[in-house]
């Protein structure tokens, strides 16, 4: 058996600033049950709880100890976590959970079940008030996986961590060897749960970085650091990097800082954080190309909205709005993904994305860098659904649909009766593009605020967000939306 508490405590020590951890509830152990848990050594009831600092910022942390009853959730275990949440809510500071949990403690039956519910309630109350981060280092099974889903960001150790509601071996016709859907790879690529995977060291470093870009709570000023980059720096190289927003953001952001979120899931949609003039800004962007670390093309995408990408973006917009983080949207979309699976999910997912943007009251700036066609473009933070500022590059194309497709419908009879179909099609396409798909036309109608050059992108975005810094927007009273 592993030495009690060593891994759980070491993770806390590695995570927090040196010497800053103060433990709370160190004398608590499990309560006696019909199964005589009093005969077992259950120090801290399997979870360390306390507070400390990350880069001098207050955080609350709990770390489950798998050497004590498998780190399972029991009455007193949960009581410690809920008490930690209560304190974090009073102080307006993030809660970080270091997860290594076998799930529900069977020996405690209803008391353990009630304990899980109280953790869920504490997380629900904290949602949108303080950031909630969990990192899974071992098991996170059954009800603990639901707790993962109630968090804002989830990290997962790449080799040993397992997240599941039902074990892969419990699914009819499946086994862990056949399809291990509890693995970090599956959870990060096929679900919308996991934001980051890596080694223990990478996860600890990643949490510290994430804390540095997030506000402490929903009333905190935007996370700010001193900007040493040139606010008027030109960005002509953006034109060659825009197909992969990760590279584009590296060009636009202060000193090239980019933190991509959920980067393994729905890769056709980029979500992440950058800094502009020292302030944290959330970014959503359509992606056409994914480059690997060597700068070679790893994957290409059609510039369409998928239901996975829409859900990913909507969740990110909701988080940024809850914590007053300004939003930048880079638009390059020509429509919706045309598959049977997409048709099953796209109406609801598209509505979710549209609602998230329309409902958000933080500063919202859009930049049209490629295509912006139809209702798919409307959903990507268009002027029509509440964008504060919409910029477009001179090369961008906007409209109801692609010009070549539009003229086939509008001028179908004229094209079919033409002696030279190709010439007629080309002529009508050019005419339609100049009249209806021009960013100049869109700007004249007020759907675009300004047409900017690629080189001026960074400084124009910074100026727009600076102007919007004190934005306040009143909405009709309602308890909450229903989308």
What positions do the PLM features span?
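Ligand-binding clefts of soluble mixed alpha/beta catalytic domains
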Residues: 1-483
